[in-house]
């Protein structure tokens, strides 16, 4: 906030954008340097031997997590106290744990500690830590970069206990960044990926908010914008419903443990991955476009989880329509893409009557509480409104007020 005040004092009288590069002293004093952590995800192509080593590491990390969780639960039940156990304590009893990367086991312990902290600090959103199953089809482990133990050279990446693994480096890491941790994962379809977390300095330059946008959540189209075309989300899950249902029926008819069942399981997994990738790509591109164009974006702080649940008496339920478009993920992506540029995402209180207020005169029309009312005329000024467009404009103006 202090930075914004300083910027306003430096503005010309006509309130145009100020060029900080016109005055190097002002430019130097007003910029902000922040440390940013950013993850890059790449496809990797391990050899058969490396796949086996990955599988062993996945299993050991899962074993340590489950073993430590089980011992903690038992110890707490007997004594009422917390057990501070570590992976090193189990290596004597289970010597095969020494064959894998020790940092993978240490990170499994950190994940368990984080699960407990989340549970104790926010029980409303986090449940008790649960045992990990090998039957989910998803496996992963994380390791840290220590003195160059993880590094990239050409089209290969070096990993502890694994060696050099072929990687599809479709985009370079951020220049002058440092590799902190990597996470190796295997999808249900059998593909291997690596997520590389890097740390770098990001220079954020103060801006005067000039371009404002309001987004109203749309059940079928992701959002309706105050000053843009609607998102028109393609509903990838709905489009793939028939194909996915057919593949799942075939899977249910395959004999347990047979090779044909495993092949069909992979086909189903590939369909799910395709839908997830399509959704991810769409959300990232939309968020990038909006973050580049606008300085402040306002949204309603709604609970998608609550909207997806059927209300008592079956009054309404948005179900799959809500969860398919990935609104929460879109908001998270949009928020950090704005923050990288020194911009702001403003979350409006969910009880703010954005759909009931006439954005022209401010009259409150209570009949729009009924969701079936999609268009209405203001009794005071006579303006004709589209429900969602009017709400988006009101959200924009409220975001403008809150960011002032």
Q: Which role does the model predict for each range below?
A:
Residues 2-105:
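Gly/serine-rich nucleotide phosphate-binding loop at the start of the catalytic core
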Residues 30-32, 171, 181-184, 199-205:
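Catalytic micro-motifs at enzyme active sites that drive phosphoryl/nucleotidyl and oxygen chemistry
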Residues 42-44, 165-169, 231-233:
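Generic detection of short hydrophobic beta-strand segments and adjacent strand-loop junctions
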Residues 68, 104, 108-119, 389-399, ...:
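Stable alpha-helical structural segments in soluble proteins, enriched in small hydrophobic residues
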Residues 69, 73-76, 116, 120-127, ...:
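Long, hydrophobic, amphipathic alpha-helical segments used as structural scaffolds
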Residues 85-188, 320, 324:
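Acidic carboxylate diad motif detector
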Residues 175, 188-404:
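Positively charged, helix-rich recognition surfaces that bind polyanionic ligands
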